[in-house]
Regions:
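Surface-exposed ligand/attachment interfaces on beta-rich extracellular proteins
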Residues: 10-14
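An extracellular/secretory-lumen and virion-surface interaction module
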Residues: 8, 36-39, 44-46
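Short polybasic amphipathic segments
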Residues: 21, 37-41, 81-85
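Low-complexity intrinsically disordered segments
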Residues: 46-114
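Short, solvent-exposed loop/hinge segments that bridge or flank secondary-structure elements
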Residues: 24-37
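Charged, amphipathic alpha-helical segments
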Residues: 2-9
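Short, hydrophobic/aromatic-rich segments at coil-to-beta transitions
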Residues: 15-22
Length: 114
């Protein structure tokens, strides 16, 4: 199982050209290429989840949770503590809160299921 690289690199003022990104929740890794979810993996076992509802879908945005129990849908890229929200291309899917956003190493990208 390859190590994931944190995206907390020094600031870069230009356009982000990286194609791959991994959104990490408590139990699951959501792997994206060019904004499309291409692989989902169980964090505990490292097993790919070929039937996951997020596969082949784009993020619609995120859901922000408030202490009073309120939820707020937010467009754009999710922030730490917000849930990923897949709202188009199938049933609505809301994940557990985001713990980190990372960049997958090349060897892990090569393992993505077809």
């Amino acid at each position: 199982m390859g190590e994931l690289a944190k995206t907390n690199a020094p600031s870069y003022g230009g356009r982000d050209r990286r194609r791959h990104k991994v959104f990490m929740t408590r139990n699951t890794e959501y792997h994206f290429r060019d904004g499309l979810c291409v692989a989902v993996r169980d964090r505990r076992t490292g097993e790919w989840l070929p039937g996951h509802l997020a596969l082949r879908r784009q993020l619609f945005g995120s859901i922000r949770f408030f202490m009073n129990g309120a939820l707020l849908p937010t467009p754009g890229e999710p922030k730490i503590g917000e849930a990923l929200f897949f709202g188009e291309g199938g049933r609505d899917l809301i994940t557990s809160p985001l713990e980190s956003v990372e960049r997958p190493p090349k060897d892990l990208v090569a393992e993505y299921p077809s």
